[in-house]
């Protein structure tokens, strides 16, 4: 376990639990969803070498053909990559390295967590090392819906387009955003996404990521996920960058003036 204790932040990172943040406290308030029995429903974890679902867990290399990925988390689809269920090597404080298994064998992923005065900087980088399989990356923070004080979490999120979804998988068609709840991919996001606990705190998520997935269907947590491409990107003929970074800026929230559901209605 790694611990970073810096001024107003206390962060616990578990390299053996997907290299994820399992606890993040700011001003003594816990902002992460704790372990609930499933590997994909707690903490803040990396999604690599793919983010979201891949239909039937099938990924295609231009040189070695079709490969079957694990589908045990969300059958029949592959979900969120190898990173969340792997043990990561500790390189330094907040710096972790993962050597990927087959069929991505030879490739690596590095992630860094850096605690600043009022923010957490989180980056994930993929190095192919000759592997030609499709890759796209993402960050999956689970924000606790309720803190020990103040209002429940609300999402401030203003997307221009939403990818239409068929069951659990995006179709590739862009549509106008619907109202919440969401388990959907978005692009052309205006402004800075945020999670707000009225009268207590807000977290603004600053990232150049071209895609975002928002999950607001869980009673205990909400997720705003910067990604380099949408779920099932390879099957949609899309590619993603091999680097994603976001700055999670913490501040007091004295009032709440607008939310995405009001924006889209």
Regions found by a protein language model. Give the residues of each.
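Beta-strand-rich N-terminal accessory domains
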Residues: 1-65, 190-209, 243-261
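Active-site scaffold segments
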Residues: 57-62, 140-142, 221-227
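Active-site/ligand-binding surface loops and adjacent short beta/alpha elements
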Residues: 133-134, 142-208
């Amino acid at each position: 376990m790694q611990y970073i204790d810096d001024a107003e932040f206390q962060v616990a990172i578990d390299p053996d639990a997907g290299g994820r943040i399992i606890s993040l406290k700011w001003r003594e308030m816990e902002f992460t969803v704790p372990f609930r029995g499933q590997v994909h429903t707690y903490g803040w974890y990396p999604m690599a070498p793919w983010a979201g679902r891949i239909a039937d867990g099938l990924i295609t290399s231009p040189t070695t053909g079709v490969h079957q990925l694990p589908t045990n988390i969300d059958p029949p689809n592959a979900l969120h990559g190898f990173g969340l269920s792997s043990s990561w090597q500790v390189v330094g404080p907040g710096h972790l390295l993962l050597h990927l298994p087959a069929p991505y064998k030879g490739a690596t992923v590095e992630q860094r967590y850096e605690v600043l005065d009022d923010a957490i900087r989180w980056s994930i980088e993929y190095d192919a090392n000759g592997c030609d399989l499709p890759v796209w990356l993402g960050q999956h923070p689970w924000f606790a819906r309720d803190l020990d004080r103040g209002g429940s979490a609300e999402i401030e999120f203003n997307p221009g387009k939403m990818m239409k979804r068929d069951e659990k998988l995006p179709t590739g068609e862009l549509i106008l955003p619907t109202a919440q709840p969401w388990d959907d991919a978005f692009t052309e996001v205006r402004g800075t996404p945020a999670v707000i606990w009225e009268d207590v705190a807000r977290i603004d998520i600053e990232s150049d990521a071209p895609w975002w997935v928002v999950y607001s269907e869980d009673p205990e947590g909400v997720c705003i996920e910067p990604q380099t491409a949408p779920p099932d990107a390879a099957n949609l003929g899309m590619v993603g960058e091999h680097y994603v970074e976001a700055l999670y800026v913490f501040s007091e929230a004295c009032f709440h003036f607008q939310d995405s559901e009001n924006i889209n209605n």
